[in-house]
């Protein structure tokens, strides 16, 4: 869920001021919900807005001060980046997983490596898979592939 994006402290302050509709120096769940709809086009329920506020509300007053708001924005940016990275990994996994089995087999790995100009034999491919095959089934699941790509 996108909350907003602010690269600098000045942008964060300006964004906070935009979301602080009543100008009291705090953002309520209702203000957050309204601004997410009007400025970002993102519909959130009262409950979701309340959960977003609660997720960073350090003092427990049910409102966001500027520092708490900045933490919310930063968390949203990290989440968005993780989603983008996950989508890219899913696409890469799909390139290697060519047999429709939902996993990368030694054969599918070999085929893709050949397309990329690397001539590995099937035993080399088995060894590559074995290194990250956490459950020992001889193939790489998407989760194992993610671990391999982040290693």
From Swiss-Prot:
Transmembrane domains' residue ranges: none
Binding site for Ca(2+) 2: 57, 59, 61, 68
Alphabetic keyword roster: Calcium, Metal-binding, Repeat
Example GO molecular function: calcium ion binding
One Pfam family hit: EF-hand_7
Binding site for Ca(2+) 3: 133, 135, 137, 144
Annotated EF-hand domain residues: 14-42, 44-79, 84-119, 120-151
Source organism, top-level taxon: Eukaryota
Residue positions binding Ca(2+) 1: 20, 22, 24, 26, 31
CDD domains associated with the record: EFh
PANTHER family, A to Z: EF-HAND CALCIUM-BINDING DOMAIN CONTAINING PROTEIN (PTHR10891)
Protein purpose: Potential calcium sensor.
Protein name: Probable calcium-binding protein CML31
């Amino acid at each position: 869920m996108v909350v907003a994006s602010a690269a600098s402290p000045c942008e964060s302050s300006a964004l906070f001021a935009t979301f602080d509709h009543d100008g009291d120096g705090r953002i309520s769940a209702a203000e957050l919900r309204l601004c997410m709809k009007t400025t970002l086009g993102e519909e959130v329920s009262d409950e979701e807005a309340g959960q977003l506020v609660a997720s960073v509300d350090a003092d427990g007053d049910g409102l966001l001060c500027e520092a708490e708001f900045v933490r919310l924005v930063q968390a949203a940016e990290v989440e968005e980046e993780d989603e983008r990275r996950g989508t890219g990994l899913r696409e890469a996994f799909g390139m290697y997983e060519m047999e429709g089995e939902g996993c990368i087999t030694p054969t599918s790995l070999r085929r893709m490596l050949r397309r990329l100009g690397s001539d590995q034999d099937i035993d080399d491919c088995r060894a590559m898979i074995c290194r990250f095959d956490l459950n020992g089934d001889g193939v790489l699941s998407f989760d194992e592939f993610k671990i391999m790509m982040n290693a």
